[in-house]
């Protein structure tokens, strides 16, 4: 059985862009602190601090040459690569170097889309065909990184070979073009993912150099781990909160001042237990069909019915070293079951892992996690 354990050593390596050719590796004794995280539908960060007095003259000289985006930071927990991404900022004081970096999705935030966004074709040979939203996301990334007028070289961030997909069972149609159908949406690729594809059911995260394009997990997916209260070091709180509960989710593009020609999408099942409990989402996005609105409603339904019970882990607490889960299994988005025996709520239910926050110093390692309610698999047909 896998256990979290306690890291015996952390190691940081500065690589050239692409993450494979080493530039510098501070000695373990010079590395005084490491923080890194993993998150879902956002860009994670890492920070290392190096004591100049223990780094040596040669290492110090190389550290002085570290350049944002020309170099990348790689973090190893014992021998396992746990985090990697481009350097964002280097700060030097009299006694230490601090290097801040962001994960590989930062490259997508720095690359502007130069391709038409019209995924309506039913021909599988057409790269821009109707398909799972995860496939559409990968195609958008691939078409922008493979080359083109403004590319310094094909796949210059070295991302395409590290994309992993977990496709949805429902096909999506996606279009973001002007009235002439030949206009390109000039925005960063990451904005396309966040503003258009995540609401339609995309869920992305990074592990090491890998970019995972997945879907929200449900109770139908297998659990990566099963935890109890003994798996946590410190206090925990159970919160049953109806603020975001719903048996039906509605999405509309209706304007308060003019409702002519508006459409809506609805997802869910009226509950005999809660009755009809609605949640309304308004979108100002243009050109959305009823199917598009249904996609957004479907993606937003997860975790609302039944009323979610959250597991809160106060700041400073984290997983115990005996927790039956490995760092490799702590991938944001996966299902993790928790049994809170001994609590009045008698909680035993599945969750989704939303964040992993790790801090290492000479005093030891702390691994914090955030767990959010998970939804049942959707049952129903599109409009």
Where are the regions a protein language model picked out?
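Beta-strand-rich assembly/attachment modules of structural machines
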Residues: 1-130
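Acidic, small/polar-enriched beta strand-loop surface segments
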Residues: 2-22, 118, 126, 130, ...
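Short beta-strand and beta-hairpin "edge-sheet" elements
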Residues: 28, 74-102, 205-207, 337-370
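Oligomerization/assembly interface segments of phage tail-like spikes and tubes
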Residues: 36-57, 95-107, 251, 305-322, ...
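A mature extracytoplasmic/lumenal domain signature
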Residues: 52, 103-105, 208, 255, ...
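Short intrinsically disordered coil segments
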Residues: 63-68, 115-120, 228-232, 368-372, ...
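Glycine-centered loop/turn motifs
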Residues: 66, 70-72, 182-186, 333
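Charged- and aromatic-enriched interaction segments used to assemble
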Residues: 93-96, 102-242
